[in-house]
Amino acid sequence: MPTRSSVLLGLISLFILFACRSAYAAPLATLAVETGRFARVETPVSVSLAGVPDVESGVSLRLEEVKGSQRIGVPAQIEAGNPPRLWWILEGTTPAETTRVFELVKGEPVETTSVKAVKSDEFLDIVVDGKNVLQYNHAVVPAPQNMRNVPPQRRSLYDRSGFIHPLWSPKGSVLTDIHPPDHYHHMGIWMPWTHTRYEGKMVDFWNVGDGTGTVRFAEYLSTTDGPIYGGFQAVQEHVARQTSEGEQVILKEVWDVRVYNVGGPDEGYWLVDFKSTQRCIAPEPLIQEEYRYGGFGFRGAREWKGEDSAYLTSEGKTRADGHATRARWCDNAGKIDNEWEGVTFYSHPENFGHPEPMRLWPEPDNYIFFNFCPSQLGEWEMDPGVDHVFRYRWYVHEGKIVVEGAERIWNDYAYPPQVQIEVNES
């Protein structure tokens, strides 16, 4: 005959069981990820959390994948905003036309390695699991002391802030270059405009040596650490130095850079998203003249030269025939210590002029320089108060590019998985 204590214990156990079932039956939200026409491999996904209860209350939230009777914890990250967004990685390989189901519940989040933004007085490093990915330079980096064909009194025109260098490969090679002797104004990864007009006068934010323009870091809006991505938002100023008002900020620009917690040295790649939002804050428009280069630029490692370097575009173009063509993506690669490494740049489908025309150096014995350049299409204007948004994904990889892999990254970027959310309002 059961004792009073055993009956009480049984009731407590039954209560706990029903409580657990109730919790599983009533998540805060159910999320269905649909891969669509393409297979996915380690793909970042996100969804708006508008209307989801407790998201902004400080309550700990946990993401779980539902696989039959199993619920498997998944690392996730909430991006602040109005509304906030939930980010996670669709782990592993997921076939096309597949749906995976997740639930957002109250509970401790899954712990994993994180992406960190580490700031010093001179620069900010983005680090994944202790490995450097990229460095953003907010302090002014002086030009070299001995510059060929540049008078000493003009050397300071080449001092710069507001650019990325180094960009590291997964195994730690430096893939960018700054102040190279053939083009002292090249600054790793940077985004100035070249042939522009303001108040009817030429302003060159790119070449800088004529003293008419430059770009400089202004301030950080945010830095982010997290299990899914880390990054920063930085304000930059495009400055015309010889206007009727003297030195004047013409464009206010925000860089939003995030590095995802995928790939790494073992998998041989990094994945980076870059967004530039530019607004003319001057009283008159900035006129962009038709020109062969200007905009998002990349100067490759000094080792990448001649036969030890290569371009390949999404349309199959190379160094020999790629300049002034248009493409969805372009791979830039070369040998360092006798091993191939590279970075593929993807132009977002919503970018102005997409698929964007490109500046590639065609000379067979030259270095690697790359530029998405919408100004090749003709003259255009940046009117006061209007935002111009440019988005680019970077696939930083070991080895030569594999077209199938490059296209997979493109599909993730241009046609991301769709996430359907059902909010439990009870």
Where are these regions (language model features)?
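Short, well-ordered beta-strand segments enriched in hydrophobic/aromatic residues
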Residues: A29-V33, I126-G130, V272-C280
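Bacterial N-terminal signal peptides that target proteins for export
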Residues: M1-L11
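Beta-strand-rich recognition/accessory modules
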Residues: I89-T94, F345-S426
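Active-site/ligand-binding surface loops and adjacent short beta/alpha elements
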Residues: L286-H354
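Bacterial N-terminal signal peptides
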Residues: L9-R21
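Acidic (Asp/Glu-rich), glycine- and aromatic
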Residues: Y136-S169, V262-A310
